[in-house]
Structures are given as C-alpha cells and as structure tokens.
Amino acid sequence: MMYGFQNEDFLKTLNGAVAQIGEINRIADKVSDLGYKNIYLVGTGGTYAIISPLAYMLKTNSALVWYHEIAAELLAAKPRSLTKDSLFITASLSGTTKETIAAAEYARSMGATVISFVGDRTAQLAAVSDYVVENAACNDNLVGELHIQFFALGARLMMKNGEFPQYERFVETLRKMPEVLLKVREQNDERALAFAEKHKDTGFHMCVGAGNTWGETYCFA
C-alpha cells in the first residue's frame, strides 16, 4: 500500500465532499438567481492547478464567460472585467494562503461575490468570502476532494444556465467517486512503485498534459 496512505481518511474526506453537494447546489442556485456576468477561477500554486479541469469543463460545455487566474497575477493586473457582476471562486486547505486571501479581498472590494472552499471555516479566507464550503482534508486527499466540489459547482452553474443536460447523471457519478478513486489507487500501487524504483535516479523528467489533464500535469511538475 502507498506509504503513509490511509484508506479510511481518504474515504472520509471524499465522502465529506460528496456530502457538501447539497450546500454547493444551494449556493449555485442563489448566485444564479441573483445573476452574474462572468466567473473567475482563482488559485495559488496547487489550487490554481486543481481548478484547471473546471475551467476546461466550462470551456467545452458552456457559454458562461470565465477566467482562470493565478491570485498574485490577478492582483497585479486588476482586470477590468472583475466587477460586482463577477463570481470569484477559489480554495485554500489552510485558508491562510496570503495571495489568495488578498485576491479575494480585492474581488470583494470590486463588488464580486466570493465563493471559497476551505478546510476550516474559521480561517481568514472564509472570513473574506460570501459563501464558504468547509470540508477537512489533508494533502494526500485534497485533489480528489476539490475535484468533486469544483465539478459539482460548475455542473450546477451550467444547469442553471440552461446547459449541461447530462447534469443528473454527472452528479450521480460524482457521488460514486470516493469508492472508485480508492479502487484506482489500490489497482495502481504496484505499478506506481515499479515506476518510482525504475526512475528514482532519472535525471530529467518531462511532464506532458493537455485538456482536462493539464492541471494535474502542472501540479505534479
């Protein structure tokens, strides 16, 4: 089994993400009913990478206007399209990532609606957000957790926009992901170990990805 990996913790975290789908739907429905003109998907480091598949999902399935931004670059650029009619979506496990907090604060100063995903509702990022989704996690299971939650939010926003007719089937698939992803990990343990042993001393690694895998590639690199 993967070193330091705990099946119970993995399932608890991902099932926790699934349990938040109802709250995510409530948030998506409310902001959709209030109306917005564009969506900002913002992160720092790994969070910027992990939200990338949601950007690709919107790109290939929706007419919604979206922007995928690194928090610090957004602060430097101060895009004119970030306004009171924007949704600002971000995440931070600790809720203390300074660039993300600063970007969220700036977005709110422009009147944007801030939705954040955090591991602790008492963290600073939550305090500067309009809507907060809380689910405790750790680095071993954060990626799967955020994918479930980001995809649930994106799918609901598209559905409320009169798009994504496969919404119900998609969400039912998301609900199955904790067990499915655990099985994938277990099935690939030996393969991953063999790869690591073979290439642990390899001097140069090239990480290649495209489409909805680009973010994972960026994160790994």
Predicted segments with their positions:
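Active-site phosphate/pyrophosphate-binding segments
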Residues: M2-N38, V133, N139-L142, A155-A221
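Glycine-rich phosphate-binding loops that contact phosphosugars or nucleotide phosphates
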Residues: D33-M177, A210, A221
